[in-house]
Amino acid sequence: MKNLNKRIAVVGATGAVGRVFLELLENNFSGKKDLHLLASKKSEGKLISCGDQQFEVKDLSTFDFSLVDIAFFSAGAEISGEFAPKAVSQGCTVIDNSSKFRREEDIPLIIPEVNGDVLKQINDPIIISNPNCSTAQLLVALKPIHDLFEITRVD
């Protein structure tokens, strides 16, 4: 397992998708984690485990995103729309799981297995979006075929 050397925030940490993010962090990275769990004011103070560490949930509305390098957003389009630009303006790269930014031309739509190499070209904090789950699964399956035959359209 790799050590996690990034400061990370999980927005929507108390929800189902937020918990999956935490599980992935726990299962794929060892050692101490500089992790900030963010949710609504009503969840503030709640303790959540990730690996052998306990983390206190913080109020998203007052969080200083300059404290983290990457924020995973999984709290819905409205929350992403309000807080993702704020995070970027404070120097944090956002990986957004909502539909909010999927159709924005200047925001990359990334599936790591398909076009993750695009991330190597990014130097400044930005918002990164991902497609919905069925699109992602389809494109992961089509990628090896595209590499051989250059698929230009899927109907």
Name every feature range the model reports, one short phrase each.
Residues 1-155:
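N-terminal Rossmann-like NAD(P) cofactor-binding subdomain of oxidoreductases
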